[in-house]
C-alpha cells in the first residue's frame, strides 16, 4: 500500500497543503521532506549552510503541523561529494536527528559516489533506478549489504519506459525495483487518480507475487 509522502520546500505549497490533510492521521504516514533547494521566482537556489538547514527543517515542521519528520533528504544540485564533504548540511541534520526533530537523514543525489558516501555517513539515499537507467545500482547493493534505506525516484522512467509490444511497463518497472533487496520504497508521482489506483494495484500484485 501507500504510507509514504514525499514533499519538499521546493515543491510549491506542497507542505502547506499536506499539514491540514494530515490532521488526525499523522501516525499513519511516513513523511519525507528535503533541505538545500529553494524554488523562487521560477528558479532554483541552493543553500547547504548549517543555518539554512536548521531554518528549513523548522519551517517544514510548522508547515506540516508535526513535531517530527521521519526522513529529511538533502536536495543535491548535482555536486554530491562537494555537498557532503565541504558543507555543514549533513552535520546539521545529524544534530537535528539527535534532537528528535527528524528521525533519519540522507541524500537525494545524482551520482554513485555521492550515494555511497551518503549511506556511509547517513541513513538513506534517494536514487534514480528504472528500466532505462541503472547506473546507480551499486548504491542499492551497498544499502542491502549494510542495512541502509533506499528510495527510488523516477521509478517509472517518468512514464517513458520503453519495452516490447505487449509488455506492461508499470509491472516490469515494479518487478525490477522490488526485486532488489536494497529498495525500501519508490516515489510514484501522478496527477491522474485512475493512474494512481492502477499503479497501486500493480505494485500490490508484484509485492504479493500475484
What label would you give each PLM region?
Residues 1-33:
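N-terminal binding-site loop/beta-alpha segment at the start of enzyme catalytic domains
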Residues 5, 69, 105:
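Glycine-centered flexible beta-alpha turn that most often forms the glycine-rich phosphate-binding loop
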Residues 15-25, 56-64, 137-145:
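Short amphipathic alpha-helices and their capping/turn segments at secondary-structure boundaries
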Residues 28-41, 74-75:
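A short, structured active-site edge motif that brings together acidic residues
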Residues 38-54, 80-82, 161-167:
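Active-site mouth loops of central-metabolism enzymes
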Amino acid at each position: 500500500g501507500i504510507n509514504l509522502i514525499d514533499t519538499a520546500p521546493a515543491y510549491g505549497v506542497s507542505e502547506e497543503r499536506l499539514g491540514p490533510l494530515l490532521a488526525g492521521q499523522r501516525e499513519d504516514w511516513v513523511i519525507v521532506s528535503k533541505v538545500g533547494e529553494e524554488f523562487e521566482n521560477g528558479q532554483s537556489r541552493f543553500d547547504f549552510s548549517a543555518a539554512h538547514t536548521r531554518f528549513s527543517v523548522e519551517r517544514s515542521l510548522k508547515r506540516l503541523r508535526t513535531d517530527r519528520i521521519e526522513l529529511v533528504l538533502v536536495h543535491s544540485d548535482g555536486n554530491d561529494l562537494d555537498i557532503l564533504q565541504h558543507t555543514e548540511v549533513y552535520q546539521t541534520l545529524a544534530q537535528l536527528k539527535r534532537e528528535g526533530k527528524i528521525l533519519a537523514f540522507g541524500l537525494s543525489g545524482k551520482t554513485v559516489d555521492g550515494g555511497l558516501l551518503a549511506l556511509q555517513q547517513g541513513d538513506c539515499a534517494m536514487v534514480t533506478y528504472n528500466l532505462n537507467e541503472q547506473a546507480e545500482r551499486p548504491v542499492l547493493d551497498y544499502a542491502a549489504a549494510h542495512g541502509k534505506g533506499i528510495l527510488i525516484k523516477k521509478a517509472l522512467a517518468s512514464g517513458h519506459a520503453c519495452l516490447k509490444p505487449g509488455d506492461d511497463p508499470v509491472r516490469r518497472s515494479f518487478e525490477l525495483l522490488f526485486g532488489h533487496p536494497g529498495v525500501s520504497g519508490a516515489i510514484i508521482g501522478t496527477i491522474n487518480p485512475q493512474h494512481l489506483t492502477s499503479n497501486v494495484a500493480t505494485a500490490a500484485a508484484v509485492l504479493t507475487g500475484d
